[in-house]
Amino acid sequence: MTEEYSNLRSNVSLLGQLLGKSIGGHLGEEFLDKIETIRQLSKSSRAGNQQDGVALIDMLTHLSDDELVPVARAFTHFLNLANIAEQFHGISRHCDSGVCAPEPIKDLISKFKNSNLSQQEMQQSVNELKMEMVLTAHPTEITRRTLIHKHIAINDCLSYLEISDISDKERDLLLNRLEQLITQAWHTNDIRQKRPTPVDEAKWGFATIEKSLWQAVPQFIRDLESELQSGLGLSLPLEASPITFTSWMGGDRDGNPFVTAKVTQEVLLSSRWVAVSLYLKDISQLTDELSMDNCDPALRSVVGDNAAEPYRAILRKLRSELKETLASLSATLQNQRSDEKDIITTSKQLKEPLLLCYHSLKNMGMNSIANGLILDILRRLNCFGINLLKLDIRQDAERHGNTLSELTRYLGIGDYNAWNEEDKQAFLLQELNNKRPLFPSQWNPSAEVQEVLDTCKVVAQTDPEALGIYIISMARQASDVLAVQLILKEVGCPFRIPVAPLFETLDDLNNSAAVMKRLFAIDWYRGYINGIQHVMIGYSDSAKDAGVIAANWAQYTSQEALVKLSAENDINLVLFHGRGGTIGRGGAPARQALLSQPPGSLKGGLRVTEQGEMIRFKFGLPKVAVQSLNQYAAAVLEANLLPPPAPKQEWRDVMQQFSDQSCQEYRHFVREEPDFVPYFRSVTPEVELGKLALGSRPSKRKPSGGIESLRAIPWIFAWSQNRLMLPAWLGAGTSLKTLLNEGKKPLLQEMYQHWPFFHTRLEMFEMVFLKADEELTKFYEERLVPKELWPLGQRLRDNLTLTRETVLETIPDHQLMQEQPWIKESISLRNPYVDPLNMLQAELLYRSRENGDEICPVVDQALMVTIAGIAAGLRNTG
């Protein structure tokens, strides 16, 4: 690495040396020398020495069974440690300017000052700032929670080590602690022995709140308020909740048979239990702090004249109620009878006494105390409520259709699934307006239908404050939305949970505005939504369906159409972005991603999924979380107050041509090429990925299905493992080359320089090209793929090369990642450590498949370690 990153290089070197010491102590210096030889050969091969590349392959393919797991683990652990050092560097006091995001709120304030925005416009936008992060347990978080805790402790040690006046003794103690942690990690099994349950996944989400976000959220709001006040004279209302968190863990049952109504109920209770326990700690600490005896008349009238410590009198009662609530929740979770006397069931019960104390402190001139812990607790309440995380419910549209189909057949009125859309809507609206029950009391539905009904009953019996929205995956028609609302009505849901269609395929995205227009034309529906409509935009499945370019353009144009339609109907539209960390799933840095959205699309707030390993990278440490939230807040405010101009018509025409041709090229390979599926299955670890205990959800929607039933996440994950990265670029090269050949290069460069959407798209390609490696993919092919399929592999690799060349020809400086030199440097650092894992993985896949049905535990374990290591090295893999 260059001198510019010397502090980061120093930390990477330190952690690497300590890892080497741990490995040498365990397996001996001779083994450590072998690891060093592999490392040096890989670096030399990366630098262009083909002879060393051959020697590296020879060395890795001739490892004994006893060496397979330790070699894989050595490189995987180094990459994990490099990730820790890099994450720490982003919040370090020695962070290089090219690595650390400049303070985004300060930068934004400068832009606002140079604009024609009025104080009122800015204040209104600040008041309306709303960001909702939806945490999901998609199966990409490779690292075990046990190791994550050790990684956090390593980060803490690095933080203490950079204190300038640390004594030699303190430094030695910290280095000793670092060595202990790295040695503990080395001697800990990297791979989960069994799949996590949905409840386990939910607890992982709770831990992220407890360990990081509980501290980060009030600090973020404090920083935001301070910057806005000092820079623009803007205030943040006390009741403001610019950030909230929701979860899919325990609520997302789309294709996951393990998420049952019972599981959802348990997760809801567990979430509240964690929240109450955290508030109990806060209130206990606040009780210690608020020992003052001066209070205002409002507080005195509540506690009485004899209370010597009025604040403590209020807080002790609150503490007692929290203890009772915790005991009641514990009993319920253990299937015991609970005493529900004096328990807290709403945020209001907790907030009102705290507000009484807060205003009293203000009124008595104790502003510094009022602006301390009690304000932090109030802001936590605004963010987390009494439930910690709201829970979204997600279910496939087909399951609701099957429920109504079974019902109508029982009633003898036909088969709902066989009706056309008009007949479905007529039936649904008739029953939605009918006061008599539709479900017969003697009806005994099938187990699958009963599960749908039980889930809706859980929704009906849950405090609305604990729920987010109900999402319908693979939504295609207005009836898909009305069907959910009818089922909820029939199970007795007393409130109107927002119901959001999720448009996932290319056709469904293009048809989304027409579907919503039909719904907005229904009087009953307009009354139900009360002026607010949630719509979810699918990124991963649309890219898998049509290729990344066509999917991105459909996402953009569908959002434009939905924004326009909602404005015409005076409806507040909340777009929910189902993005991931990979390019094939919409992954891009927060600011770039948000500012490349259509103008006006963030007016209703930001709602976005944070998935898998990205939760840890963005929110795993309090300082990192504050940084991430600042970036999101600045981007949303900028997008709403200083939106990018709408694209010119000629840009749109070029983009449409790019989209159409890239979709055709993508589908030609994926759908029409007869060798594609067998090639995919043999050249990637797709089958083996199904064995890895990643998440609770199966990798396929239907166990017997082919590519079309494979979930988008394992589809992308498999291609990233062999470094072809196919979902992130396939289809783009040929279509872009056609545009260049038609003389549209000046127009494409104009789009790159002046249209954030197009600029971000090409920049994401640039990052993919730094991670992709045709030669490594070719090695997988030669080791694993039948020779008759090799010509297809060559065509795909040639296509990648063409795509890289055409993107380089299009961008003005003709070099990859010139605007993001740190990302380029980071990838260059990792590649020599990821490459041996790829070569070893190909060898392990070969050995595993040669064994047939015979299980070889050593080979399988080593294979799983390489999968984890490559994921760590590539970072945004799922």
Swiss-Prot record:
Keywords: Carbon dioxide fixation, Lyase, Magnesium
Keyword Magnesium tagged: yes
Gene3D superfamilies registered for this protein in UniProt: Phosphoenolpyruvate/pyruvate domain
Catalytic residues (UniProt): H138, K544
Top EC class, one word: lyase
GO BP field: carbon fixation; oxaloacetate metabolic process; tricarboxylic acid cycle
PROSITE patterns tied to this protein: PEPCASE_1, PEPCASE_2
Any one GO CC term of the record: cytosol
Gene Ontology MF: a single term: phosphoenolpyruvate carboxylase activity
EC numbers, comma separated: 4.1.1.31
Reactions catalysed: oxaloacetate + phosphate = phosphoenolpyruvate + hydrogencarbonate
Pfam families linked to this entry: PEPcase (PF00311)
Cofactor(s) needed for function: Mg(2+)
Family indicated by similarity: Belongs to the PEPCase type 1 family.
Function: Forms oxaloacetate, a four-carbon dicarboxylic acid source for the tricarboxylic acid cycle.
Protein name: Phosphoenolpyruvate carboxylase
Gene assigned in the entry: ppc
